[in-house]
Amino acid sequence: MKINGTPYRTIWLAKDGRTVEIIDQTRLPHEFVVVPLASLEDAAKSIKDMWVRGAPLIGATAAYGMALATLADASDAGLERAYQVLHATRPTAINLKWALDEMIAALTPLPVPERSAAAYARAAEICDEDSAQNAALGEHGAAIIAAHHKAKNRTINILTHCNAGWLATVDWGTALAPIYKAFDAGIPLHVWVDETRPRNQGASLTARELNWHGVPHTVIADNTGGHLMQHGMVDLCIVGTDRTTRNGDVCNKIGTYLKALAAKDNNVPFYVGLPSPTIDWNVADGVKEIPIEERSDREQTHIFGKTEDGVVREVQVTPDGSPAVNYGFDVTPARLVTGLITERGVCEASPEGLKGLFPERA
């Protein structure tokens, strides 16, 4: 995607061929800062501290983290240590484990001296694959938006939650890829952007992306979506996912479940965009089996913003002594999902639907 006319991905190899560079997303929307990653520890910190986030981008960063680790120690023990360090950073996004498993499978059969070059090559492939998958699912999702426009012959209003745009992936995004593809094809649309507390990733990241791309959008408080749906102001919802089970349960940013309930009650289609590495074929019941990350309560009790003098500051929004809890994700049962938008097409959120698109997993 482009920022002020310059094409960017969210992660890329620096000119030295060894250092990896990322956009520090904790500094957005007010600052655009590129950060170099030169070691396994740098990569792990970038994931844990959410300089990068979004399931596909976490996976891509972990892949490059493995490559960086081989510069210091490409032995079997070194690979195992790197795997464990990176795997421990964030528990919910399945792309993290998927990417690490891909790297181990590619590297362990090779002689130690050949592993570093192979690691960088496989990490680059994972990034390219993610971009291609997201572009493809974007086309499938854009067809859904086009069908709504054809039926209603007016601007289509789409509600999204958190950030599942290109900042959450290597490029294009998941939930936002259909929006970008449809917008670029000339379909009139407007996006309702949930602010997505407590980290405000909708207000800070999704709005920033849509602004860069010129897509009409409006930021709303998290609890506004139901009201909009009741009054016919939402034509469809499209969200992303950090892990989707083989039965079609969808784990995504906290608050997604409530949007799906409101959509169901108001007959608003609720779609989920995901590349296939986000499917966890080993898990059936998302509510019971997916580990839900619990983050620092400080994210709930404090908030960042830009003051009138242009300084970005953190302020406390809760009383001293009030405890807070900060679950990062929730699970939307498959019965509330209209369809899953993947790189192979759109399917029902069910074992049969997923196996129809991915028969090799049957």
Swiss-Prot record:
Record site feature (Transition state stabilizer), residues: 162
Name the catalysed reactions: 5-(methylsulfanyl)-alpha-D-ribose 1-phosphate = 5-(methylsulfanyl)-D-ribulose 1-phosphate
- Pathway assignment: Amino-acid biosynthesis; L-methionine biosynthesis via salvage pathway; L-methionine from S-methyl-5-thio-alpha-D-ribose 1-phosphate: step 1/6
EC number(s) on record?
5.3.1.23
Summary of the function given for this chain in its UniProt record: Catalyzes the interconversion of methylthioribose-1-phosphate (MTR-1-P) into methylthioribulose-1-phosphate (MTRu-1-P).
The Swiss-Prot or TrEMBL record describes its family as follows: Belongs to the eIF-2B alpha/beta/delta subunits family. MtnA subfamily.
User: What is the protein name stated in its UniProt record?
Assistant: Methylthioribose-1-phosphate isomerase
